[in-house]
Amino acid sequence: VIFVGIVPNNRKKDYTPWKSVVGDIEYGGQADAYITWVADAVIPYLRKCFRISQDRKDIGIAGASFGGLVSLYALFKHADTFGHYILISPSVWYPDFVKFMKSQPIINSTHHIYWYVGQLEGKQSNHLNQYMVPQTEAAVDILNELLVSQTSVFYFDTNRKGLHRQYYFKKYFNRAINKLF
């Protein structure tokens, strides 16, 4: 497994699927450009430098929080690029994201997905992320309905004491790697 970490210029811009304003926070909605850059520039560059499979089933995308959101978004926008998805606490509370998922067609191709969320994520917030757990539950149900390939694998994991913190992101990222690869 070769793992490449990409530091975003601006997570709120690069990793969000469409522009939105929540309270006084502006989100840039540049996820399409980010995913296209990864698919059309980063992966081909890595293939030139390393012996990496040409088969999308061997290529994955992963992220936590907004990184998880953009990784999930990639499933719908670039399903032909990635075969594995690690979604650690993806920010599916993002305005209209669950609605977006409901509007997507069924996914016939094979994908291996690991999704984690802590049961206490957002509980102490008065921001939209207070809906993290119920929005995750709705999104997981939708994804289960959309994944129709008999060869797809979908793991959903949770921790009743889990918070939206790096400690949990690392712990469950390691679990995801062990499950998917």
What are the roles of these predicted feature ranges?
Residues V1-F181:
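Non-catalytic cap/lid and distal C-terminal segments of serine-dependent acyl enzymes
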